[in-house]
């Protein structure tokens, strides 16, 4: 892998490779000194044209745990706000010696454009482009699911896929780059995916995606699921009314207290509840569901650092087929 731009074209080998490397990286977070020397002397630039808290901080933590130098670039207050183009910004970063660029952009396809040009000779990681994709979010979601699925089945997670796992993704699919990346990646890993949303919040052409589509959340739950992922209603991307009211939306497509009890009533004791964040509590998910023992919300945040460490390591350390660095040995080098 030279870049990480999309999950649609990510092979099963590469997907499992990232997840397995993330397993190695997660051990770093359990140590007293949470650092490896793997990317010492490398420079990672977080190039964010959209506001972000979780993703930017997660990438920064990941890069620093690998001993890379990190430059955080926000469009607000920069030359971009004065009209500087993506090309000029990229060439400026190239002149500064950037080895990797983590880019979030409001325009779908911007990371692909950056990777396809000669503006900068650096690894490009898509941290979210418009409503298109968010590959590292999908990878950390898959990492979280794989750990849970392996625990349920009593198997090792390393080297495993998600064959047979039933995943429902509900909410604002139309504006969700997370949904798109998850559908492609989960299909590659062998999971069965069902999208649940009102017709107004489903994109044109969704019938051609490798998943099922439902308009009824209760029917989807009754059919049986192993993971329930709720998506945030992205009001900032809406310029029209996509549903009658927030109350009606919550009643029909939100994961409320009643649906939380339904999992128990249906005997689905191992079903987990996921959310990529940030959450609209009381709209797409109730506080009881978000804070329940079934919730993996905080685990997803924690796993995100490990997955992003893996992505940076595989892109910048040379041969992506090499094994992850020996954590115990590297511990001695950094102490």
UniProtKB/Swiss-Prot annotation:
EC number(s) from the headed UniProt entry: 2.1.3.2
Keyword set includes Transmembrane helix: no
Disulfide pairings: none
UniProt xrefs under Gene3D superfamilies: Aspartate/ornithine carbamoyltransferase
Gene Ontology molecular function terms on file: amino acid binding; aspartate carbamoyltransferase activity
Annotated binding of L-aspartate, by residue: 82, 177, 232
Highest rank taxon of the organism: Bacteria
Enzyme class, UniProt record, top EC level: transferase
Pathway membership: Pyrimidine metabolism; UMP biosynthesis via de novo pathway; (S)-dihydroorotate from bicarbonate: step 2/3
Keywords assigned by UniProt, alphabetized: Pyrimidine biosynthesis, Transferase
One GO BP annotation of this record: 'de novo' UMP biosynthetic process
Reaction equation(s) it catalyzes: carbamoyl phosphate + L-aspartate = N-carbamoyl-L-aspartate + phosphate + H(+)
Gene Ontology cellular component list: cytosol
InterPro entries: Asp/Orn_carbamoyltranf_P-bd (IPR006132), Asp/Orn_carbamoylTrfase (IPR006130), Asp/Orn_carbamoylTrfase_sf (IPR036901), Asp_carbamoyltransf (IPR002082), Asp_carbamoyltransf_Asp/Orn-bd (IPR006131)
Residues that, per the record, bind carbamoyl phosphate: 54-55, 104, 134, 137, 277-278
Family: Belongs to the aspartate/ornithine carbamoyltransferase superfamily. ATCase family.
Assembly behavior: Heterododecamer (2C3:3R2) of six catalytic PyrB chains organized as two trimers (C3), and six regulatory PyrI chains organized as three dimers (R2).
Record's function text: Catalyzes the condensation of carbamoyl phosphate and aspartate to form carbamoyl aspartate and inorganic phosphate, the committed step in the de novo pyrimidine nucleotide biosynthesis pathway.
PANTHER family in the cross-refs: ASPARTATE CARBAMOYLTRANSFERASE (PTHR45753:SF6), ORNITHINE CARBAMOYLTRANSFERASE, MITOCHONDRIAL (PTHR45753)
HAMAP family: Asp_carb_tr
Protein name: Aspartate carbamoyltransferase catalytic subunit
Organism field: Paenarthrobacter aurescens (strain TC1)
Gene it is expressed from: pyrB
């Amino acid at each position: 892998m030279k870049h990480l731009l999309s999950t649609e074209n990510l092979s099963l080998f590469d997907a499992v490779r990232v997840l397995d490397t993330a397993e190695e990286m997660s051990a770093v977070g359990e140590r007293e000194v949470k650092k490896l020397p793997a990317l010492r002397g490398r420079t990672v630039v977080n190039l964010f044209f959209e506001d972000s808290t979780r993703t930017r901080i997660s990438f920064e933590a990941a890069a620093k745990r690998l001993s890379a130098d990190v430059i955080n670039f926000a469009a607000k207050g920069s030359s971009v706000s004065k009209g500087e183009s993506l090309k000029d910004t990229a060439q400026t970063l190239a002149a500064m010696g950037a080895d990797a660029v983590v880019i979030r952009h409001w325009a779908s396809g911007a990371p692909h454009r950056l990777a396809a040009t000669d503006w900068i000779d650096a690894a490009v990681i898509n941290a979210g482009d418009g409503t298109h994709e968010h590959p590292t979010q999908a990878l950390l979601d898959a990492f979280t699911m794989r750990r849970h699925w392996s625990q349920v089945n009593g198997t090792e997670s390393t080297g495993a896929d998600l064959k047979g796992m039933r995943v429902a993704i509900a909410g604002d699919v139309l504006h969700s780059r997370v949904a798109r990346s998850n559908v492609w990646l989960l299909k590659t890993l062998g999971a069965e995916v069902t999208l649940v949303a009102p017709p107004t919040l489903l994109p044109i052409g969704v019938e051609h995606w490798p998943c099922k589509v439902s308009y009824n959340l209760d029917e989807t739950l009754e059919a049986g699921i192993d993971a329930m992922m709720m998506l945030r209603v992205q009001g900032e991307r809406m310029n029209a009314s996509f549903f009658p009211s927030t109350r009606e939306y919550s009643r029909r497509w939100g994961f409320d207290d009643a649906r939380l009890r339904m999992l128990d009533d249906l005997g689905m004791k191992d079903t987990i509840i996921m959310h990529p964040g940030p959450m609209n509590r009381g709209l797409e998910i109730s506080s009881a569901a978000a804070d329940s023992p079934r919730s993996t919300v905080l685990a997803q945040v924690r796993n995100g650092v490990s997955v992003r460490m893996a992505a940076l390591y595989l892109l910048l350390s040379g041969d992506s087929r090499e094994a992850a660095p020996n954590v115990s040995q590297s511990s001695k080098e950094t102490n």
